[in-house]
C-alpha cells in the first residue's frame, strides 16, 4: 500500500510540474477590492512601464479609469490604462462587451491628448461581444421601470449585452468581420427579439447596418485571436498585467446582488475573460481606497451621511468618471475587505488616497459586523436584507493632521499614518506593498 501511495504521489508531482513548466512567465492581476473607483488605473499605469502586455478581461464602457501621465489626465472606459505606455501591447479580451461607437470616440479623445499609434499596440478579441445602441435604450428603460428600486446602472447597455450573450443570440466582433450578410441576418434577429420584449424602442435597422459596415475596415486591424496571442506570449516569457474593471463588491456572483454589474470582476473573471488557466496567475494586487466609496444604489454599511461623508466627498473629488454622479462616502470596512480577499486571494495590497484623510483628528475603521440582536457575524452577509440588518463596530485611530501629499518615502509619513497602514495590514493578514498620496504615478510610495 505504501508503494502505491508513493507512486501516486510522484505522478501527481510530475503532473503539477508539467502543467506549470509550460509557461515561462506569470500573469499579474490588479483588482478593485471595494465598490470600484479605488485607483486601479493609476496602479496599472505604474506597473505597465515594466510589462509587455496589459489586458482588460470583463465589463465594458461602464468602467472608468483616470490616469495622469506626464501632467496629462487621461480618462479610459474601454481602453486598458496601459495604453499610455507606448512600449506596451494593450488587449481587450473575450470577456469584455464593446460598444464600437464609444470605443472609437474614446480613441479620438485620447489621441487629441497625445495618445498616438494605437493601431500598432491595441488588440481586440474576435470573441468579444458587441453592445448595440438598442442595448443601451433597453438598459435605461429597465432602470426606469424599477422606479424607487433602481440598481444604479450606468445605462451603457452592459447588462442587456451580457443578457444577449447568455441567451446565445449576442453578436461577437469576429462575426462583424466575417460574411456581412450573415452579420446582417443575426443583427435583424436580435433586434426583432428585443422589439418583441420592448415594443417601444426604435431601431433604424438599415442605418445601423450601414454604420456597422463602416466599422468593419476600421476595427479589422485591431482584431486577433487573443487567447492564442496571450498563451504564446506566456510561453515566450512575456510579462502580462491584467486590469480588472469595476470591483469585487460589484461582481455578479460575489457582490451585493442585485446592486452589482453583469460580469465577474473578481479573479474568476480574469480566467474566463482572457482564456487563461489558473496556474498562470502570479501576483493578485488588491487596490483599496483608504476609505470607502460607492456610486449608485445599494447597501453601504460604513456610509457616513454627515459632515465626514461630505468632507471625504469634497477632498477626494469623489465624482464618477463614467456617470458623473457624486460618490457616496464612508469609513474603511475591514469585514468587506476580508471577504473580497477571501474570494480573490490578494497577495498584496495597494492603499490609495491616504492623503484625503490628512485633515481628520481621528479616523474610524469598521472592524466587525453584528446583528441587531447583538450576535457578531463571522461571514459577510449574502443577502441585502441581512446586510441591511447589521451594525458596524468601529476602531478609532488617531489622525495625523498634516499633509502627506508630497511625501515619497514610507518612513517619512507621520507615525499615525504609518500606523493606519499597518493596522489595515494586520487586520487583513496581507502585506501592503504601496501607498498612494496623490494623483500621479509618482505619488505611489513603495512600502517594503
From Swiss-Prot:
Pathway: Purine metabolism; AMP biosynthesis via de novo pathway; AMP from IMP: step 1/2. Its cofactor is Mg(2+). IMP binds at residues 37-40, 62-65, 154, 168, 246, 261, 325. One of its GO terms (molecular function) is magnesium ion binding. Its EC number is 6.3.4.4. Substrate binds at residues 321-327. One of its GO terms (biological process) is IMP metabolic process. Keywords: Cytoplasm, GTP-binding, Ligase, Magnesium, Metal-binding, Nucleotide-binding, Purine biosynthesis. InterPro entries: Adenylosuccin_syn_GTP-bd, Adenylosuccin_syn_Lys_AS, Adenylosuccinate_synth_dom1, Adenylosuccinate_synth_dom2, Adenylosuccinate_synth_dom3, Adenylosuccinate_synthetase, P-loop_NTPase. It catalyses: IMP + L-aspartate + GTP = N(6)-(1,2-dicarboxyethyl)-AMP + GDP + phosphate + 2 H(+). HAMAP family: Adenylosucc_synth. Homodimer. Plays an important role in the de novo pathway and in the salvage pathway of purine nucleotide biosynthesis. Catalyzes the first committed step in the biosynthesis of AMP from IMP. Belongs to the adenylosuccinate synthetase family. This is Adenylosuccinate synthetase. The lineage of its organism: Eukaryota, Metazoa, Ecdysozoa, Arthropoda, Hexapoda.
Amino acid at each position: 500500500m505504501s508503494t502505491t501511495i508513493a507512486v501516486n504521489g510522484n505522478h501527481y508531482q510530475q503532473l503539477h510540474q508539467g502543467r506549470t513548466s509550460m509557461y515561462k512567465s506569470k500573469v499579474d492581476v490588479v483588482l478593485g477590492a471595494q465598490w470600484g473607483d479605488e485607483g486601479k488605473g493609476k496602479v496599472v499605469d505604474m506597473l505597465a512601464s515594466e510589462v509587455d502586455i496589459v489586458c482588460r478581461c470583463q465589463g465594458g464602457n461602464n468602467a472608468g479609469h483616470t490616469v495622469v501621465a506626464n501632467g496629462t489626465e487621461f480618462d479610459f472606459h474601454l481602453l486598458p490604462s496601459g495604453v499610455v505606455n507606448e512600449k506596451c501591447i494593450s488587449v481587450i479580451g473575450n470577456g469584455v462587451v464593446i460598444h464600437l461607437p464609444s470605443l472609437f470616440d474614446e480613441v479620438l479623445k485620447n489621441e487629441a491628448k497625445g495618445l498616438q499609434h494605437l493601431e500598432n499596440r491595441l488588440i481586440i478579441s474576435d470573441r468579444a461581444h458587441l453592445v448595440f445602441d438598442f442595448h443601451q435604450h433597453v438598459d435605461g428603460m429597465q432602470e426606469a421601470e424599477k422606479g424607487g428600486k433602481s440598481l444604479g446602472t450606468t445605462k451603457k447597455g452592459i447588462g442587456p449585452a451580457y443578457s444577449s450573450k447568455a441567451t446565445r443570440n449576442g453578436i461577437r466582433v469576429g462575426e462583424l468581420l466575417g460574411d456581412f450578410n450573415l452579420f446582417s441576418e443575426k443583427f435583424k434577429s436580435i433586434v426583432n427579439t428585443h422589439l418583441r420584449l420592448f415594443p417601444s424602442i426604435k431601431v433604424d435597422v438599415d442605418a445601423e447596418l450601414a454604420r456597422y459596415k463602416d466599422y468593419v475596415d476600421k476595427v479589422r486591424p485591431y482584431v486577433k485571436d487573443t487567447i492564442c496571442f496571450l498563451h504564446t506570449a506566456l510561453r515566450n516569457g512575456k510579462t502580462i498585467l491584467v486590469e480588472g474593471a469595476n470591483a469585487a463588491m460589484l461582481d455578479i456572483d460575489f457582490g451585493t446582488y442585485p446592486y452589482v454589474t453583469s460580469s465577474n470582476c473578481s479573479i474568476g473573471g480574469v480566467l474566463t475573460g482572457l482564456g487563461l488557466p489558473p496556474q498562470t496567475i502570479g501576483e493578485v494586487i488588491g487596490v483599496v481606497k483608504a476609505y470607502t466609496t460607492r456610486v449608485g444604489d445599494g447597501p453601504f454599511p460604513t456610509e457616513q451621511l454627515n459632515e465626514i461623508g461630505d468632507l471625504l466627498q469634497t477632498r477626494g473629488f469623489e465624482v464618477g468618471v463614467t456617470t458623473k454622479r457624486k460618490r457616496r462616502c464612508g469609513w474603511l470596512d475591514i469585514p468587506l475587505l476580508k471577504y473580497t480577499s477571501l474570494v480573490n486571494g490578494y497577495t498584496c495590497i495597494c492603499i490609495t488616497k491616504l492623503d484625503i484623510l490628512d485633515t481628520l483628528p481621528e479616523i474610524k475603521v469598521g472592524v466587525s459586523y453584528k446583528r441587531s440582536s447583538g450576535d457578531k457575524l463571522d461571514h459577510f452577509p449574502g443577502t441585502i436584507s441581512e446586510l441591511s440588518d447589521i451594525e458596524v463596530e468601529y476602531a478609532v485611530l488617531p489622525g495625523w493632521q498634516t499633509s502627506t501629499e508630497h511625501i515619497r518615502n514610507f518612513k517619512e509619513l507621520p507615525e499615525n499614518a504609518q500606523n493606519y497602514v499597518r493596522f489595515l495590514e494586520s487586520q487583513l493578514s496581507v502585506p501592503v506593498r504601496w501607498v498612494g498620496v496623490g494623483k500621479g504615478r509618482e505619488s505611489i510610495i513603495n512600502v517594503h
